[in-house]
């Protein structure tokens, strides 16, 4: 029978990774329970703003054929899950609460809208564990575990635009060693495969973007829209250690799914047309923007080009603000921007009148007190300020941080999951199944 499996919360801040678990689980099910993977695994990013998430807040969806009941499959998977979090990720020691969710494929089709709504809620909002358990009970979803149930159910509902990520995994003896990736080979990947792969190298800070920084099992991950070019990229990248195994995931990364539905509560995303009241460049380079609606927006120095553009905004400019709503001890509520689109630029500036005697510049003596010439000191009592057109070093359009988050869609990216993508996936899946059978991993 055909089933959908959701998996979450198998990593920790020290070791392990939910994607890593999903690959060795798929191999284990294939070799020991004749369970066939029917589609590429799905890497599902959820709410990026939740404070207690690990790294990328990702869950996994698998579609498999299993000769048994939903309960039997859940028992097999959760037993393997417990071994992984005890022996590999040490997740329980670090406050993780793994979970799984399973539903029959036929039932999934009839519950599609409900599951999709749960998925979107998992991206936009914070879902209580009790809500997830009641949802599972009401819709006959088999669950095991604890908090990871939330992300597992959300993963079941993933649908819509997707990209791919190819992830390579390290041998266990290398997990505590520094990753040594030849940077020139990563640049070569960019030269030969961009834009079908992307986010490979940061040319501003001169460092690769494909490597994580923790002790997790991942060597590197490459994002793209073509499996063929992801494989080519992997073949081009040079490292001082051998790859243990790799997988290609379908993923909602880089699709802007987090802006499909927005809100106005803490840890939700916001997309809002605002008019700028004033900006302030803070010590250190962060930009604080106040709006005519009394919203407070922050554009942090680390956002690079976005921060530079924000410094050039002024009163009267109109933008669409994209960002996350966060609590602030100082301001109560702030919006952290990851992108803005300039709709209207205020290209007018109020200027003091010229001196009628010598033509020199003047300075204000205070409200309704007139102006004083800076050169000849003549006092003007009746003149008013005038408007002057100014040149702005900005243009209408979208400005975005170069260090975009997992879900953020790059400006250049076109998403076209077409028949060519389908044929690529089928071809790769056949090869991937045989690799899964060869994989020898013992917990």
Curated annotation (Swiss-Prot):
It catalyses: cytidine(34) in tRNA(Ile2) + agmatine + ATP + H2O = 2-agmatinylcytidine(34) in tRNA(Ile2) + AMP + 2 phosphate + 2 H(+). It is found in: Cytoplasm. Coiled coil: none annotated. One of its GO terms (biological process) is tRNA wobble cytosine modification. The keyword Disulfide bond does not apply. Its EC number is 6.3.4.22. Keywords: ATP-binding, Cytoplasm, Ligase, Nucleotide-binding, tRNA processing. GO terms for cellular component: cytoplasm. GO terms for molecular function: ATP binding; ligase activity, forming carbon-nitrogen bonds. ATP-dependent agmatine transferase that catalyzes the formation of 2-agmatinylcytidine (agm2C) at the wobble position (C34) of tRNA(Ile2), converting the codon specificity from AUG to AUA. Belongs to the TiaS family. This is tRNA(Ile2) 2-agmatinylcytidine synthetase TiaS.
């Amino acid at each position: 029978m055909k089933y959908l499996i959701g998996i979450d919360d198998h990593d920790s801040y020290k070791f392990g990774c939910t994607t890593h678990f999903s690959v060795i689980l798929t191999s284990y099910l294939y070799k020991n329970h004749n369970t066939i993977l029917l589609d590429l695994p799905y890497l599902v990013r959820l709410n990026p703003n939740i404070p207690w998430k690990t790294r990328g807040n990702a869950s996994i969806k698998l579609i498999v054929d299993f000769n048994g009941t939903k309960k039997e499959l859940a028992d097999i998977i959760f037993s393997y899950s417990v071994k992984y979090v005890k022996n590999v990720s040490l997740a329980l020691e670090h406050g993780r609460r793994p979970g799984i969710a399973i539903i029959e494929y036929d039932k999934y089709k009839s519950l599609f809208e409900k599951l999709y709504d749960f998925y979107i809620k998992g991206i936009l909002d914070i879902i209580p564990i009790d809500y997830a358990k009641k949802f599972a009970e009401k819709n006959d979803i088999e669950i095991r575990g604890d908090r990871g149930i939330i992300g597992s159910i959300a993963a079941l509902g993933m649908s819509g635009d997707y990209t791919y990520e190819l992830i390579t995994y390290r041998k266990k003896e290398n997990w505590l060693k520094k990753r040594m990736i030849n940077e020139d080979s990563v640049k070569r990947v960019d030269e030969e495969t961009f834009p079908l792969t992307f986010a490979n190298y940061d040319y501003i800070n001169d460092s690769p973007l494909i490597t994580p920084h923790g002790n997790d099992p991942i060597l590197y991950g490459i994002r793209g829209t073509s499996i063929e070019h992801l494989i080519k990229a992997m073949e081009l990248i040079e490292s001082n250690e051998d790859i243990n195994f790799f997988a290609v995931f379908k993923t909602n990364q880089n699709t802007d799914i987090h802006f499909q539905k927005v809100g106005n509560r803490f840890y939700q995303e916001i997309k809002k047309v605002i008019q700028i009241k004033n900006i302030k460049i803070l010590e250190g380079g962060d930009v604080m923007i106040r709006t005519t609606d009394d919203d407070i927006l922050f554009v942090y120095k680390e956002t690079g080009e976005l921060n530079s553009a924000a410094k050039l905004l002024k009163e009267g400019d109109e933008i669409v603000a994209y960002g996350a709503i966060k609590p602030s001890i100082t301001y109560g509520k702030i919006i952290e921007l990851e992108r803005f689109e300039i709709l209207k630029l205020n290209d007018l500036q109020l200027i003091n009148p010229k001196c009628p005697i010598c033509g020199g510049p003047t300075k204000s003596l205070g409200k309704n007190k007139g102006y004083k010439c800076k050169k000849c000191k003549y006092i003007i009592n009746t003149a008013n300020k005038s408007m002057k057109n100014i040149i702005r070093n900005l243009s209408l359009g979208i400005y975005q941080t170069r260090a975009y988050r997992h879900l953020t869609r790059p400006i250049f990216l076109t998403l076209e999951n077409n028949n060519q993508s389908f044929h690529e996936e089928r071809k790769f899946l056949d090869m991937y199944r045989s690799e899964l059978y060869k994989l020898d991993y013992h917990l």
